Amino acid sequence: MRLFGYARVSTSQQSLDVQIKALKAENVRATRIFTDKVSGSHVNREGLRMLRLKVEEGDVVLVKKLDRLGRDTADMIQLIKEFDDMGVAIRFLDDGISTEGTMGKMVVTILSAVAQAERLRILERTNEGRLEAKAKGVKFGRKPTVDKAEVFTLHGQGISAMEIAKRLKIGRSTVYKVLAS
């Protein structure tokens, strides 16, 4: 039996350090730790793909948390089945569960379904909040870019920089920068 590790964060700005440290504490060799810095909703992850190629029957894959392996219940079930068909067990360190045995597989399936439901609830609440804010007039996203042609046109008509700034709802310094360019 060989131990392998898998760690994932959703973005390249996040750190894998905590997960890798936990895997090493379980005696997983650094050369057997596979990582990804992409969303768990992406099924074709490079680190996961490499892990699938390396493991053999009797091996065990350690993952710090259930949601690090995947986000979607159907994808998680498919991954677990794929590893199970290869004779490879998955153990989730923080959750204290394993795919070894029928009960372990059932628990993992239920927990991944609960995790997915929670994510959907969070998305729902976020969207409701966004719609409510929008109804109250809250603006989202970047401010519109400055229409430089309009700044030059108004300036050509003899309108002051302060008045141009008011009309176009931009800073006076922005007007000066456009005129200087």
UniProtKB/Swiss-Prot annotation:
UniProt keywords, alphabetically: DNA integration, DNA recombination, DNA-binding, Plasmid
Homology family: Belongs to the site-specific recombinase resolvase family.
Naturally occurring in which organism (per UniProt): Pseudomonas putida
Ranges of the DNA-binding region feature: 161-180
Annotated active site: 10 (o-(5'-phospho-dna)-serine intermediate)
GO MF annotations in UniProt: DNA binding; DNA strand exchange activity
CDD domains (alphabetical): SR_ResInv
Residues in Resolvase/invertase-type recombinase catalytic domain copies: 2-137
Domain of life, per lineage: Bacteria
BP-aspect Gene Ontology terms: DNA integration
The UniProt record lists the keyword ATP-binding: no
Free-text function comment from the UniProt entry: Site-specific recombination protein.
Protein name: Resolvase/recombinase
InterPro entries: Homeodomain-like_sf (IPR009057), Recombinase_CS (IPR006118), Resolv_N (IPR006119), Resolvase-like_N_sf (IPR036162), Resolvase_HTH_dom (IPR006120), SSR_resolvase (IPR050639)
